[in-house]
Amino acid sequence: MACLGRPGCRGWAGASLVLVVVLALAACTESVAGRAMRATDRSSGLPTSAKPARARDLLLQDGDRAPFGQVTQSRVGDSYFTSAVPPECSAALLFKGSPLRPDGSSDHAEAAYNVTGPLPYAESVDVYTNVLNVHDVVWNGFRDVSHCRGDAVGVSRAGRSTPMRLRYFATLSDGVLVWTMSNPRWTCDYGLAVVPHAVLVLSACGFKPGFPMAEWASKRRAQLDSQV
């Protein structure tokens, strides 16, 4: 386990010695997340003969249940960030076009979800024909998210967010990275879930902290692993 920003967790120096796991970045504040630099190719390059699943089929579907209730798919809107200031916070802030996703996917899909109350939630998934190195994708995600060390502003078509800070990031289970960006008025919890042929990015934002992203991202990873 590696974590930072909560009592009982070791700092970054200790965390860097631990095998890291994934996330699901995402981004939002009074607006939500976006797009930016793409990561270098982190796949192992190993081919597979299995026919890849359709990315859209791997997202939560209408009527599925999440921690906040039953969901209905909708379009990822203009409030999701397309860039971050400073750029080194892109990995921690962006959902749409997250740089945590390895290059070379064969299919991509994303969706926002209509839920009860002020909790914007979204998922994106990329499918890969080649086998991903799960450890490397998660480790690189942990490293890239940790580079956001001060105030970060998300920029979207809807405008600029108020500054947020990275409050917590951890790899609490295999293939999963979670982190939290927040300010006094808004909290965004992100998750990255990685399996050998797919990467799932999760974003949940709201006025109050406490979304169970670690448990939810681990559950979504297990579901993903059974589908691809």
From Swiss-Prot:
The chain crosses the membrane at residues 191-211. Its main location: membrane. One of its GO terms (cellular component) is plasma membrane. PROSITE patterns: PROKAR_LIPOPROTEIN. The keyword Transmembrane applies. A lipid is attached at residue 28 (N-palmitoyl cysteine). It is found in: Cell membrane. The keyword Cell membrane applies. It is a lipid-anchor. Residues 1-27 form the signal peptide. A lipid is attached at residue 28 (S-diacylglycerol cysteine). Keywords: Cell membrane, Lipoprotein, Membrane, Palmitate, Signal, Transmembrane, Transmembrane helix. This is Putative lipoprotein LprH.
